[in-house]
Amino acid sequence: MDHIGRFELLISEMKADGRYRTFVELERMSGQFPAALLRGRDGRSRRVTVWCSNDYLGMGQHPDVLAAMHDAIGRFGAGTGGTRNISGTNRQHVELEAELADLHGKEAALIFTSGWISNLAALGTLGRLLPDCAIFSDALNHNSMIEGIRRSGAERFIFRHNDAAHLDQLMASVAPERPMIVAFESVYSMDGDVAPISAICDVAEKRGAITYLDEVHAVGLYGSRGGGIAEQQGVAHRVTLIEGTLAKAFGVMGGYVAGPALLMDVIRSFADSFIFTTSLCPHLAAGALAAVRHLKAHPAERARQWENVGRLKAMLRAADMPVPDTPSHILPLMIGDAHLCRRTSELLLEDHDIYIQPINYPTVAHGQERLRITPTPYHTEAHMRSLVDALVAVRARLGWSTPRVAA
């Protein structure tokens, strides 16, 4: 087989479809978020405004977080020197896990090197260890959840997105004595919609199923202490396992799962993606711990973000931009064509110093291409006006029509 030819063909097909991804080299500037320096191919840099960061609350540059990280590096060095089982567990890990368990009202928590790994480890392990397990997965679940379920080898049932009635139908078709897991998200990252957690728990509880809730795009952002949508809706006690990330609203890196102590012990003891990897660096755990503690006690960042989300959404819709009225902080601007989406992103960056990464297949379905806008507490009204004016200008230049979106 001509391996080189095969690989070249795959890349050329991606480029022809408008799906080829390029890296944009950015240098974040401490204390100046959401501004960053864009480094061009010629080595020159210029200042741009970032509108697609997952550092939702700017905690990646918060003084408390940075101070904790600097202190940890000075005291403990860079890495841990081992896995959690072999010399790689430290005080920062233990305190962070206790803080996360408290955040969600659970008995215990377990941290991982990323949110992707935490889903892979937890779902992959639990589904594998439960004999004849059936896993029920929302149709729009994240890739990490899909891969974890696939890796478990358990039989998978896909229920229509956010459709508790369809979930009930599927669960009724399975023998009641089989172990069952219902896996879903609270805030869906591409559409910005929110799951009916209580209704899904109603169905799961009726069948005696484990509920597994991914709160990656909600922790830190929702609830009186940043415990996510489940905390905000008062249903966290009904969810068996809550998974989250330390790399978005908390601004650092890593992932975690919180739940019953027995299940945490099972994952810790049987998940190869936990057992056989070096543990999270002490300064990352220390920074995440500072972020979690700050957001538990201080709602100011959340309040400012919500003000900005509402303000920008109103401005975009007043300009007839195709932004659905989502209930979350995520504002998808629907383009519906891969090439136009990519070119829109390029022109925003080239002509207006605004960076929003295009979202194309396979992250979203063909025909659902979009720009994913994430306002933060630190975007100003001037930033918003510049963004709306730039989008109006780019739309006029490219001639893309405004797709119909939900009111």
Predicted features and spans:
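Short loop-beta-helix segment that forms the pyridoxal 5′-phosphate
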Residues: 82-87, 97-121
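N-terminal "arm"/small-domain region of PLP-dependent enzymes with the aminotransferase-like
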Residues: 2-6, 10-76, 209
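Conserved PLP-anchoring active-site segment centered on the Schiff-base-forming lysine
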Residues: 123-143
